[in-house]
Amino acid sequence: MLKIRLTRIGAPKKPCYRIIVTEARSPRDATYTDLVGTYNPMTNPETVIINAEKVLYWIGKGAQPTDTVARLLKKAGIVNSN
């Protein structure tokens, strides 16, 4: 099963995240299938860059976003609250 989830990048105490598509059982920082965006919670306001076409493509292929990624997608207006 594919998941759309976050993987951590950045320096210690300064997190930044990639939004990736990967197998559900793979480790957090393992290789990934596709990079669909980035998320930086340290900026004010938070910076979220998401490729909507890629996200919708992978959701169409059966990828499930994690709760955090689903919140980011909803906030960006890419998916509905369903």
Swiss-Prot record:
<keyword id="KW-0689">Ribosomal protein</keyword>
<comment type="similarity">
    <text>Belongs to the bacterial ribosomal protein bS16 family.</text>
</comment>
<dbReference type="InterPro" id="IPR000307">
    <property type="entry name" value="Ribosomal_bS16"/>
</dbReference>
<protein>
    <recommendedName>
        <fullName>Small ribosomal subunit protein bS16</fullName>
    </recommendedName>
</protein>
<keyword id="KW-0687">Ribonucleoprotein</keyword>
<dbReference type="Pfam" id="PF00886">
    <property type="entry name" value="Ribosomal_S16"/>
</dbReference>
<dbReference type="InterPro" id="IPR020592">
    <property type="entry name" value="Ribosomal_bS16_CS"/>
</dbReference>
<dbReference type="InterPro" id="IPR023803">
    <property type="entry name" value="Ribosomal_bS16_dom_sf"/>
</dbReference>
<dbReference type="GO" id="GO:0003735">
    <property type="term" value="F:structural constituent of ribosome"/>
</dbReference>
<dbReference type="GO" id="GO:0005737">
    <property type="term" value="C:cytoplasm"/>
</dbReference>
<dbReference type="GO" id="GO:0015935">
    <property type="term" value="C:small ribosomal subunit"/>
</dbReference>
<dbReference type="GO" id="GO:0006412">
    <property type="term" value="P:translation"/>
</dbReference>
